Amino acid sequence: GVLMDVGHGLHNLSFDVARKVLDQGLHPDSVSTDGHRGNRAGPVYDLPTTMAKLMALGFSLNQVIEMATANAAKLLGRSAEMGSLRVGHPAEISVLKIEDREWKAIDSQKGTIPAHQAITPVFAVRDNTIYEPLAAARP
């Protein structure tokens, strides 16, 4: 079968195209970003913002978390060591804040759709180290 990833980058996410694909019953298996210095101030911002954009397109919070964790690990062939929390395995944890607020989600072509929830990174934990989020502009 075909596996599909939403890899939001500077030039490759269109809400118009996404709606057409979703209307035909095709749904992404995972979500990722091409996050770098050139798109952290928009349109990509970060993975939590991209996840919130998918929520604005109709996906649930649980669906986008699964796309960003377990499904992404499976697509990389690494589900044995990442993508879930299990006893005896290393834990990499992102703590996210879900905010009920109105904002405009922006795609790579400057198209917008209304969004009703935002996902904000609070901190991450890896190898017993806490990491604060990078200071970045957010929509």
What does each model-found stretch correspond to?
Residues 2-3, 56:
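A polyampholytic, Gly/Pro-enriched intrinsically disordered region
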Residues 3-5, 30:
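Structural preference for beta-strand elements that scaffold enzyme active sites
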Residues 5-15, 75:
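Active-site glycine- and acidic-residue-rich loops that bind
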Residues 7, 42, 83, 109-111:
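Glycine-centered flexibility motif
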Residues 8-10, 34-35, 67, 98, ...:
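Fold-independent oxyanion-binding glycine-rich loops
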Residues 11, 37, 41, 137-138:
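Generic structural signal for short, solvent-exposed loop/turn connectors between secondary structure elements
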Residues 16-98:
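His/Asp/Glu-enriched, well-ordered alpha-helical/loop segment
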Residues 90-138:
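C-terminal cap of metal-dependent C-N hydrolases
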